[in-house]
């Protein structure tokens, strides 16, 4: 029996479910449909005509049969927002998955919303200190900016992300939202306990749609996290939004696109790649009410930065932190590439003359060393001029001083984590490029915090 608001399933292929409605009551695209018998939510993706809509399931379609009643909720998926979500883990539908009872929020918001209009948006040039030397010096983050952590498999995107959350959440004392998009469940679990032990869990809302979830779930979980962040922003707060991993969002889009029968474009990606990325990224912005500072991990397939997925993401970011396998192989962590990473904030008008000069000096020294590497490999160090020898020695010290022990890696390394203030970072690197520490051995600069620690370490070597 079908009423005006209900339809029936007519075809099920994997995560795609076709539902037939009376012709005068066809659901709109992005409306949420409810299958009560299987407790399943479907999201309308296409209207096929004759009252039939094609939907993507937000959960498993196992056991779903034809001719089951489907109810139209007549609105998009809505999720709870506000302070009640802090310290809780939710799924894509905003349902708690931490077994701590229901989330009694006063308000629910749809996950599909237009981006703030041009007039509502606001820019800012205030810097966000992270306590990580290489980031603060060479690719500083802006409050209300967007940052991408680019890296291939196993170079430390998630560890860097967790360190940033720990440092910023503790020092910044604002609210954070973490969206786990298609990542490992183990990492989500580790992250939850890490937050609990650092006593910052009551300031973080967690939204997980991990690797084992169906593609529709992974495609929408980023929007769920974003909706929570937007709600905090519209209350007038400065909120942090962490997304791990934006590539899996694209990948879920590829799967959904293929299931819906669209013709793939370059490298097999969906033809709507740029539009899907824009729909998410354009909403991550600061308005006159408050700001969203977003830090996103971006997996780089086969370490190829020109792949359409990372290349599309680049266009939306204010700062890019590129993690390099070559640096990781040398045992320097965080394995951030000081020459490849960039930031729009690296401007003397924003960061000040001294910071700018030191950052450029560090990059020039490292660039000179890169250029001399071939000569050193063929002829050896002895063939270089005195100036070049000095540049190489300083560059090697800078490379080591760019490493730093992390708080979240204490368990593995046994070395206590270090938070280095921006002033200490600038002072340390300024000293190295000015030759104040030329007599210290290279090893003294490895895995220390401030320059004073390097001087202390040199005494024991």
Curated annotation (Swiss-Prot):
Disulfide bonds: none
Gene Ontology MF term list: ATP binding; ATP hydrolysis activity; proton-transporting ATP synthase activity, rotational mechanism
Entry superkingdom: Bacteria
Cellular component terms per the entry's GO annotation: plasma membrane; proton-transporting ATP synthase complex
Positions contributing to ATP binding: 151-158
Catalyzed chemical reaction(s): ATP + H2O + 4 H(+)(in) = ADP + phosphate + 5 H(+)(out)
A Pfam cross-reference name: ATP-synt_ab
CDD domains attached to this UniProt entry: ATP-synt_F1_beta_C, ATP-synt_F1_beta_N, F1-ATPase_beta_CD
This enzyme's EC code(s): 7.1.2.2
Entry membrane topology: Peripheral membrane protein
Record's keyword terms, sorted: ATP synthesis, ATP-binding, Cell inner membrane, Cell membrane, CF(1), Hydrogen ion transport, Ion transport, Membrane, Nucleotide-binding, Translocase, Transport
Sequence similarity: Belongs to the ATPase alpha/beta chains family.
Binding partners and assembly: F-type ATPases have 2 components, CF(1) - the catalytic core - and CF(0) - the membrane proton channel. CF(1) has five subunits: alpha(3), beta(3), gamma(1), delta(1), epsilon(1). CF(0) has three main subunits: a(1), b(2) and c(9-12). The alpha and beta chains form an alternating ring which encloses part of the gamma chain. CF(1) is attached to CF(0) by a central stalk formed by the gamma and epsilon chains, while a peripheral stalk is formed by the delta and b chains.
Function: Produces ATP from ADP in the presence of a proton gradient across the membrane. The catalytic sites are hosted primarily by the beta subunits.
Protein name from the UniProt record: ATP synthase subunit beta
Species name: Coxiella burnetii (strain RSA 331 / Henzerling II)
Organism lineage: Bacteria, Pseudomonadati, Pseudomonadota, Gammaproteobacteria, Legionellales
């Amino acid at each position: 029996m079908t009423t005006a608001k209900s339809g029936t399933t007519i075809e099920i292929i994997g995560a795609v479910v076709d539902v037939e409605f009376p012709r005068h009551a066809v659901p709109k695209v992005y409306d949420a449909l409810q299958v009560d018998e299987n407790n399943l939510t479907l999201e309308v993706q296409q209207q096929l005509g004759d009252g039939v809509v094609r939907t993507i399931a937000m959960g498993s379609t196992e056991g779903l049969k034809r001719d089951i009643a489907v109810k139209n909720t007549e609105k998009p998926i809505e999720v709870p927002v506000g302070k009640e979500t802090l310290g809780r883990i939710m799924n894509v539908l905003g349902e708690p998955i931490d077994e701590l009872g229901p989330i009694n929020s006063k308000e629910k918001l749809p996950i599909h919303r237009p981006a703030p209009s041009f007039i509502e948006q606001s820019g800012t040039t205030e810097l966000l200190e992270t306590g990580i030397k290489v980031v603060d010096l060479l690719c500083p983050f802006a409050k209300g900016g967007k940052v991408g952590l680019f890296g291939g498999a196993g170079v430390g995107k998630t560890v860097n992300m967790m360190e940033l959350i720990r440092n910023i959440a503790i020092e910044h004392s604002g609210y954070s939202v973490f969206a786990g998009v298609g990542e490992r469940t183990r990492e989500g679990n580790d992250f939850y306990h890490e937050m609990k032990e650092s006593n910052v869990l009551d300031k973080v809302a967690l939204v997980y749609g991990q690797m084992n979830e169906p593609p529709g779930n992974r495609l929408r979980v980023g929007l769920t996290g974003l909706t929570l962040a937007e709600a905090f922003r519209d209350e007038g707060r400065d909120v942090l939004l962490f997304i791990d991993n934006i590539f899996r969002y694209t990948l879920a889009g590829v799967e959904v696109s293929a299931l819906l029968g669209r013709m793939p474009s370059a490298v097999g990606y969906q033809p709507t790649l740029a539009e899907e990325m824009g729909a998410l990224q354009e909403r991550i912005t600061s308005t006159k009410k408050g700001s969203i500072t977003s830090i996103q991990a971006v997996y780089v397939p086969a370490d190829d930065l020109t792949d359409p997925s990372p290349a599309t993401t680049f266009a939306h970011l204010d700062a890019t932190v590129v993690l390099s396998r070559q640096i990781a192989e040398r045992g320097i962590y965080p394995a951030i590439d000081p020459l490849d990473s960039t930031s729009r904030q690296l401007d003397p008008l924003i960061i000040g003359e001294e910071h700018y000069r030191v950052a450029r000096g560090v990059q020039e020294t490292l660039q000179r060393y890169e250029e001399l590497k071939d000569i050193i490999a063929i002829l050896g160090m002895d063939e270089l001029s005195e100036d070049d020898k000095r540049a190489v020695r300083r560059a090697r010290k800078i490379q080591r001083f760019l490493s730093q022990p992390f708080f979240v890696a204490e368990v593995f390394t046994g070395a206590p984590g270090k938070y280095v203030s921006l002033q200490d970072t600038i002072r340390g690197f300024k000293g190295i490029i000015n030759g104040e520490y030329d007599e210290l051995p290279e090893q003294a600069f490895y895995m220390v915090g401030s320059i004073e620690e390097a001087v202390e370490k040199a005494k024991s070597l």
